[in-house]
Amino acid sequence: MKTLLLTLVVVTIVCLDLGYTRICFNHQSSQPQTTKTCSPGESSCYHKQWSDFRGTIIERGCGCPTVKPGINLSCCESEVCNN
């Protein structure tokens, strides 16, 4: 009986998602580096870059958003990969 209970506990731990979350950079342009713990279910980070009257703008964060034409977007799926 103890063996069965132990087996069930191990199977439960292995099968459950134990709350792993991605960590991405989220600083903008030339600001000091900061990171953010992404929401559950967000498994990627993004690096978005475009130019306007202010110069080159860089935005970083969690997820992989859709962008308008003229905006360079790169998405990645490892820890703090969007620098």
Swiss-Prot record:
PROSITE patterns: SNAKE_TOXIN. The record marks H27, S30, Y46, F53, G55 as: Moderately important residue for binding to acetylcholine receptor. CDD domains: TFP_snake_toxin. Its main location: secreted. The record marks S29, Q31, K48, R54 as: Key residue for binding to acetylcholine receptor. Residues 64-75 are annotated as: Loop III. It is found in: Secreted. InterPro entries: Snake_3FTx, Snake_toxin-like_sf, Snake_toxin_con_site, Toxin_cobra-type. Residues 45-62 are annotated as: Loop II. The record marks Q28, W50, D52, I57, E59, K68 as: Very important residue for binding to acetylcholine receptor. This is Erabutoxin c. Residues 24-38 are annotated as: Loop I. One of its GO terms (cellular component) is extracellular region. Expressed by the venom gland. Keywords: Acetylcholine receptor inhibiting toxin, Disulfide bond, Ion channel impairing toxin, Neurotoxin, Postsynaptic neurotoxin, Secreted, Signal, Toxin. SUPFAM superfamilies: Snake toxin-like. Disulfide bonds join C24-C45, C38-C62, C64-C75, C76-C81. The keyword GTP-binding does not apply. Binds to muscle nicotinic acetylcholine receptor (nAChR) and inhibit acetylcholine from binding to the receptor, thereby impairing neuromuscular transmission. Binds to Torpedo marmorata nAChR (Kd=0.14 nM). Residues 39-44 are annotated as: Stretch between loop I and loop II. The keyword rRNA-binding does not apply. Belongs to the three-finger toxin family. Short-chain subfamily. Type I alpha-neurotoxin sub-subfamily. Residues 1-21 form the signal peptide. GO terms for molecular function: acetylcholine receptor inhibitor activity; ion channel regulator activity; toxin activity.
